[in-house]
Amino acid sequence: MAPTQSKVKIHNLAEAHEKVLRAFPIEVEQNSEGNKLLVKQIRIRTLGHADHSNDSICFLNTYGFIKEAVSQTEFMRAGQRPESKNTLTACMLPFGPGPNIGSPQKMLEYAEDIKIHVRKTAGCKEQIVFSLDRTPQVFRGFQFPRDRYVCVPSDKYIKSPGKLVAGPNYCYTITFLSLTFCPSSQKFKVPRPILNFRSTRMRGIHLEIIMKITCSENSPIRKTLITDDPENGPKASVWIHLCNLYKGRNPIKVYDEAYFAEKCKQMLLSVGISDLWGPTIAVHANGKIPKSASLYFNSRGWALHPIADASPTMAKQLWSIGCEIIEVNAILQGSDYSALVDHPDVIYRKIRIDPAKKQYAHSKWNPFKKAISMPDLTGISI
C-alpha cells in the first residue's frame, strides 16, 4: 500500500512578486499593401523597489515564432522584399538578466535587427541550439547575447519541435518582448547539480504550487488540467525542489515529521511568480535558513525556479493563458529514492502568497489551438 500524505500550507506570496502572471494578447493589423501584420508588443514590469538605479537589474524574455530562413541564393528585383516563409511553431527564448535599461521602449524596434539561427542536435536527448548572428548594442549586456548561443532540450522552449527537420535553415523571429526590473538581490537561480543532489542523510523539501488556470471551456488545454471543481475553474499542480535538510546524528534528539515541519515554519517561506527566465517561481525565505539548505538560497534568502526547468509542458501553456497562484504547500520527503518509497509525505500548508503578485492574466494569443479553430496566420508577416 502506498504511504499516506500530509502537508503544510503557505498562505501568501513573496513580496515584490505577483501571484498573477500575465500573457500577451494577439493583435493583427493590415499594411498599405493589404497584408496582415502581427503587431509587435513590449511589456514592462517593475518588481519591489526596483527602479533605474544601480541596484536594479533587468530580465529580458522574448516570445515569437520559428520559420524557415530566407535562402541566400534567391533572386530579387530592386525594391522587392524577401518572400516571407511560413511560420512553423511558437517559441520562447529568455535572454536572461542584464543591465538596467534606461529607455526600454526603444528595444522593440531594435529587436527586428536581431538574427537568431535555430538548429537541432542530439545528446542523451533531442536538443535545440539557438545561436546569435547579429545583435544590436542595446541587447549585448544580457546573458544570452554575451554567451552567443544556448543549447536546451528540444521541448523546453519550442511548442512543436517535431516540425523542425534536417536540411532547411531555421530562424527565430521575435514578436513580443517582456522586460522585468527587479532588485539585484533577487537574482539567484539554483544550480542544477544542487537541485539533483540526493542523500540518505538528508530529507528533501519540495513546493507544490497550485495555480488556477484561465482558459476557455473548449480549449484543448483543459484536458491536461484538474477539472474537479467547476465553480472555481481548472487548476494545475507544479512541483519544485526547494532544498535538503540534514537529518542529524544526535541519538537523543528526535528527528520526526514535527521537527522538519518546524524547520519549514522557521524559514517563513513566501512564494510568487514573475516572467524572468520565462514564467518563474520566486521563493523568499524571510526567516532562519538551516545550514544544510543555505546553498539553495542567496545571501538575501531568494531563489528563482523557472517553470520551464520544472515542468516544460506547463510553462509552454502559460505562454498563452493566464494563471493565479491559489495555494502553496511544502512537501517533506526522503531525499534518496529508497527512503522516498518507504516513508509517507509530510505536507506543510502555511506558505505565504503575495496577493499583489499571484496572477498571469489570460491572453488572446493561443499557439496551442488546433488548426481548425486557430486564426489564419499563414498570411501574416512576423
Swiss-Prot record:
This protein's UniProt keywords: Viral envelope protein, Viral matrix protein, Virion
Gene3D superfamilies: Viral matrix protein, C-terminal domain (2.70.20.60), Viral matrix protein, N-terminal domain (2.70.20.50)
Function: The M protein has a crucial role in virus assembly and interacts with the RNP complex as well as with the viral membrane.
GO molecular function, one term: structural constituent of virion
GO biological process terms on file: virion assembly
Name of the featured protein: Matrix protein
Pfam families: Matrix_Paramyxo_C, Matrix_Paramyxo_N
GO cellular component: viral envelope
Keyword Translocase: no
The keyword Hydrolase is assigned to this record: no
Subcellular location: Virion
InterPro entries with a match to the protein in the record: Matrix_C, Matrix_N, Matrix_Paramyxo_C, Matrix_Paramyxo_N
Family: Belongs to the morbillivirus/respirovirus/rubulavirus M protein family.
Superkingdom of origin: Viruses
Native source species: Human parainfluenza 4b virus (strain 68-333) (HPIV-4b)
Major subcellular site: virion
